């Protein structure tokens, strides 16, 4: 266990609600300014109207705000929710959750979809949704422990800055030897110093014995997270089965899950090849349809597209089953093992790069005139480590490059 010293600002102990038909009927409310932790009811009318996920997020965000609130006001909330099917093993895509807030980029509401274990672990710990408001000094970590049935607001100074090192330390510290039971949300120094910050959602890949990541990338929600003084949010849970959600009709759920999984297993190899390639399969398709962003999307295709497409990354991806939730047959998460960055803080060290996804390849590759997969991997790695949205990074740099080419800047 990694030794860390923490000061407890607030603790709430609770009796965990059992999930019934996919719901706990409670949300968790953390106010960082007041240093308070509370729970609130989710009534039947709210469930029928908003269902879960984005709906619950918008309801909780609306309830927290006044009409003139800005993204960096303490009243702005970060809301995270799964849904009634969330956390169902072997049901494709059920590890997903939605993150919602006011965007520092648009000043309007933004939501971002993210995979991993946090959404399910939050629900199984007793809460259909999480709302975080207020602000605090830095180094704040919120811990939701569904096993010990307590929530802590901690001050932990001296934690690593980048998301990779931070998630490793917190997973090690809070896991009590069962790392697969921990999911960490974090941003990074890039999120704290720009308006294009992303959030990293971790899960522990037991087969590969390493912490892995998915990103809530769009809209600058990582910037909101950092502005609140949050270092991380940690969820802890244990075993999950088809019965954990206590579905209304377990046999019907099994039947539908088998049907979906069978179709995916049969059809995916002939169509999208998500389990083998992930979203990388889109590169040649978009190039053929003149839709591959190239040179700030002045063009839609490029002869070098094959250098950053399916053939290139199929050789680089770590082989074997992958995926960011238990038993998901889409299994679209992929990564590159033992990549060695050429630059930066990790120069010369072997790292595992989660991705790249198609949007990263297009945004930080062809859109910048880069047709080298290793350069794209390096950009991908450091954007994630520092909490920067790869799409925003790629499109911003591409815009500046075209401005320079046209003589608008020097």
Predicted features along the sequence, with ranges:
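Intrinsically disordered, low-complexity segments enriched in small residues
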Residues: 2-113, 117-410
């Amino acid at each position: 266990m990694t030794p860390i010293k923490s000061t407890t600002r607030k603790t709430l102990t609770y009796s965990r609600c059992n999930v019934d038909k996919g719901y706990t009927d409670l949300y968790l409310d953390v106010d960082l300014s007041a240093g308070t932790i509370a729970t609130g009811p989710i009534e039947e009318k709210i469930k029928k109207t908003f269902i879960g996920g984005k709906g619950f997020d918008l309801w909780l965000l609306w309830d927290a705000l006044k009409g003139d609130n800005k993204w960096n006001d303490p009243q702005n909330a970060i809301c995270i929710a799964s849904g009634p099917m969330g956390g169902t093993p072997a049901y494709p895509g059920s590890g997903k959750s939605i993150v919602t807030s006011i965007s520092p980029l648009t000043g309007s509401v933004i939501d971002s979809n993210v995979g991993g274990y946090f959404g399910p672990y939050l629900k199984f710990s007793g809460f259909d949704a999480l709302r975080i408001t207020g602000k605090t000094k830095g180094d704040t970590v919120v811990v939701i422990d569904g096993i010990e049935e307590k929530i802590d607001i901690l001050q932990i100074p001296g934690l690593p800055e980048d998301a990779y090192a931070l998630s490793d330390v917190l997973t090690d510290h809070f896991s009590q030897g069962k790392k697969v039971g921990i999911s960490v949300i974090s941003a990074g120094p890039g999120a704290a110093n720009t308006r294009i910050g992303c959030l990293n959602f971790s899960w522990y890949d037991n087969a590969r014995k390493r912490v892995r990541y998915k990103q809530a990338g769009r809209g600058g929600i990582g910037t909101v997270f950092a502005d609140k003084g949050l270092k991380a949010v940690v969820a802890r849970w244990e075993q999950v089965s088809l019965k954990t959600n206590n579905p209304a009709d377990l046999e019907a759920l099994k039947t539908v899950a088998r049907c979906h999984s069978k179709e995916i297993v049969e059809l995916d190899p002939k169509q999208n090849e998500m389990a083998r390639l992930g979203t990388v399969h889109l590169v040649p398709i978009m190039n053929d349809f003149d839709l591959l962003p190239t040179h700030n999307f002045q063009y839609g295709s490029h002869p070098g597209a094959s250098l950053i497409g399916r053939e290139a990354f199929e050789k680089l991806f770590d082989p074997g089953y992958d995926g960011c939730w238990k038993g998901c047959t889409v299994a679209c998460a992929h990564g590159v093992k033992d990549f060695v960055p050429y630059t930066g803080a990790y120069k010369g060290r072997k790292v595992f790069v989660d991705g790249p996804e198609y949007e990263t390849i297009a945004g930080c590759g062809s859109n910048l005139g880069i047709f080298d997969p290793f350069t794209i991997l390096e950009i991908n790695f450091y954007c994630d480590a520092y909490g920067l949205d790869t799409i925003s990074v790629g499109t911003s740099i591409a815009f500046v490059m075209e401005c320079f080419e046209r003589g608008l800047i020097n």
